[in-house]
């Protein structure tokens, strides 16, 4: 059974979906005012693996990841460049989709935009006003955290001692400094929209709650994102949705959060200026290498970025490809009985690792162990091990999303054949016809026929 670490309960829990054989999952997407950095890519890759696990296990998956396409940062960028917010957001949405395609992210993801869901956002704000959880100050609409007794539970904070989060807006209009804005009244030189409560635009937190409700319903199985979103963003989402919709106790059953990618033990972020753009890294390393690098560390642990570790991932994938090249060629004759046990153990341990809170480093270790065991088997006897090639290919590509270099595998095969043919020709020149004929016979078994010139 799948076990996931739930931030809400601070413990590892068995995963039980709301509906049998169906998973509804939402992952917070980017605010599209810049290219994404590799720290932004971590939740995209980690939760892509989770989605792949569910698909592999036969679940019907509904997966939503949003675009925040109206925001203070987008407005600032548009004003700086003399462009519209739509032009800025469109540019970086297109860039985002290009980047994640290079990272082999599954395409079956619903990607709504905030500006396409304003009616749903307004409905939720009206619900919160009617129920008394929100109040108006001028053209602003603000959520009152004191009205929701469970506020702070997700981030494990007490109402009386809340820490101001990075994106909490301190405003004299608020009854409580930690109250948060649902609707921002119109300001000069900013886009605005009409609503029952005045001209303005949505606040950051309300967007995700509304889009989750529209595309996935009142209750969902999994909500995921980076740990920096726990407070205030996800705390506020939880408050809005639990108060504004008719949910069954909690609108999210499992809250999952990945840890940071760091540089010199410091969190990578655009605000600190210590980030590495994903598309810049892609100029030197392909998406499979970057993906492998991210998956070598458990998602709830900090991962330090370094080109040295990217090189390790690159060489590791090259070694796996070379082994697969060998296994693919050894496809004649019978399989050794021991191979069945080796493969059975691999398949069991690989899936168990991923069911243990998405333990990707352990799953990758299972691949290395399999290769070592098969090579050890081949050192003692000849055996048909082509099935190992297909088993590794299946697990690496379909579950971990790491595509192995098929061209390299085919090139290695051709190089080995060329070496054998050169050796055979030298044997014939030395009149060692017995050994030369033996090589020809063995190649014929592999389906490669050689005709000697007379």
For the regions a protein language model found, what residue spans apply to each?
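Structural preference for alpha-helix termini/caps and helix-kink/transition segments
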Residues: 267-270, 275-454
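Short, glycine/charge-rich beta-strand/loop segments that flank catalytic centers
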Residues: 67-71, 93-96, 106-121, 139-148
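Short, well-structured beta-strand/strand-turn elements
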Residues: 60-62, 132-138, 449-451
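Alpha-helical recognition segments enriched in aromatics with Gly/Pro capping
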Residues: 1-33, 48, 120-327
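Active-site pocket-lining segments that scaffold enzyme catalytic pockets across diverse folds
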Residues: 96, 101, 106, 125, ...
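N-terminal, positively charged nucleic-acid-binding surface of large information/translation enzymes
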Residues: 9-12, 18-104, 450
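The substrate-binding groove and active-site-proximal loops of carbohydrate-active enzymes
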Residues: 79-85, 109-115, 198
């Amino acid at each position: 059974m799948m076990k996931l670490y739930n931030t809400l309960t601070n413990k590892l829990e068995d995963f039980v979906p709301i509906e049998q054989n169906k998973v509804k999952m939402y992952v917070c997407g980017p605010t599209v005012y810049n290219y994404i950095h590799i720290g932004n890519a971590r939740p995209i890759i980690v939760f892509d693996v989770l989605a792949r696990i569910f698909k592999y296990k036969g679940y019907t998956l509904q997966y939503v990841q949003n675009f925040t396409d109206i925001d203070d940062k987008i407005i600032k960028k548009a004003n700086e460049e003399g462009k519209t917010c739509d032009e800025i957001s469109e540019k970086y949405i297109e860039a985002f989709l290009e980047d994640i395609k290079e990272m082999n992210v599954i395409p079956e993801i619903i990607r709504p935009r905030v500006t396409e869901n304003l009616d749903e956002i307004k409905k939720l704000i009206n619900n919160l006003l009617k129920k008394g959880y929100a109040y108006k100050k001028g053209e602003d609409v603000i959520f009152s955290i004191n009205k929701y007794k469970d506020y702070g539970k997700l981030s494990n904070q007490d109402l009386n001692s809340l820490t101001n989060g990075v994106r909490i807006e301190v405003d004299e209009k608020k009854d409580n400094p930690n109250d948060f804005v649902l609707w921002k009244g119109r300001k000069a030189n900013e886009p605005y929209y009409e609503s029952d409560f005045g001209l303005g635009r949505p606040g950051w937190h309300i967007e995700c709650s509304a889009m989750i409700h529209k595309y996935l319903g009142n209750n969902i199985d999994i909500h995921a994102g980076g740990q920096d979103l726990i407070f205030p963003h996800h705390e506020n989402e939880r408050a809005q949705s639990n108060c504004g919709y008719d949910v069954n106790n909690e609108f999210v059953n499992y809250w999952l959060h990945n840890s940071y990618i760091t540089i010199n033990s410091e969190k990578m972020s655009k605000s600190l200026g210590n980030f590495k753009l994903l598309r810049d890294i892609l100029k030197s390393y392909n998406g499979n290498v970057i993906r492998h690098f991210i998956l070598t560390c458990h998602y709830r642990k900090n991962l330090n970025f370094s080109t040295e570790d990217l090189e390790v991932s690159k060489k590791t994938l090259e070694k796996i490809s070379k082994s697969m090249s060998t296994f693919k060629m050894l496809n004649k004759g019978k399989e050794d009985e021991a191979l069945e046990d080796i493969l059975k153990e691999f398949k069991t341990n690989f899936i168990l690792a991923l069911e243990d809170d998405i333990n990707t480093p352990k799953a990758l270790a299972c691949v290395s162990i399999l290769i070592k065991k098969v090579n050890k088997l081949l050192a003692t006897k000849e055996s048909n091990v082509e099935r190992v090639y297909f088993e590794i290919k299946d697990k690496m590509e379909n579950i971990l999303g790491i595509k192995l270099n098929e061209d390299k595998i085919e090139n290695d095969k051709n190089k080995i054949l060329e070496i054998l043919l050169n050796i055979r020709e030298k044997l014939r020149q030395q009149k060692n016809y017995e050994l030369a004929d033996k090589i020809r016979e063995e190649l014929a078994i592999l389906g490669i026929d050689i005709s000697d010139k007379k």
